[in-house]
Amino acid sequence: GRWVEAVSEMAAFADAGAVPGEVTVDISAGRLLPPITAPGKRIYAAANYGDHIREMLNAGTARNDAERDDMLDRDKTRVRPYSFLKAPSALSGAHDDIILPSDSTKVDWEVELAMVVSRRTKRIAAENAMDCIAGFMTTNDVSARDWNMREDWVTLRTDWFGGKSHDTFAPVS
């Protein structure tokens, strides 16, 4: 779509010599917006970093070290990632304030690598995946961890949307 066209236009602009060798911009008087202000959807992959999984299990999911190690071993055999979405209102700029919910005492964050998909695609073969990648950004996955676990819903237990989709909980740069 438009992303591919814009990248081509920027490359042509640069190739034509229209950009001086060094360009500087004073950003102190402005606000850095997210590089993509209205993404179609943002899919996050949870539990993709071993040390963080271990940290979270030690923080309360596992009752002891043996149970934690058993959970980690079981997770290694999974093929499909545990995915979740964030609300559009969670998107914010890299230097915007993160608004903390007044009734949460366990706000936490993780730095993540965000991949920008350049066009609509479904079930693409792994060997063709990079053909659909426009680039990469950094983001923070901010969570109200005390909202993620739902003791009032014993059968479901988790509400990741409620814990991770507060306004400003997805700053991007």
Indicate where each model-derived feature is located.
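N-terminal non-catalytic cap/leader segment that marks the start of a structured domain
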Residues: G1-Y82, S104
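Solvent-exposed alpha-helices and their adjacent loops that cap or buttress functional pockets
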Residues: P34-A38, D73-T77, S83, A90-S92, ...
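Flexible glycine-rich active-site/ligand-binding loops centered on an Asp-His dyad
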Residues: A66, V79, L85-K86, N128-V154
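Ligand-binding beta-strand-loop-alpha-helix segment within the catalytic cores
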Residues: K86, D96, V111-L113
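Active-site glycine-rich loop that binds ribose-phosphate moieties when present
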Residues: L91-D103, V117-R123
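Residues embedded in well-ordered beta-strands
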Residues: E112-V116, M137
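Functionally critical, mid-to-C-terminal surface segments that flank or help form catalytic/ligand
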Residues: W160-S173
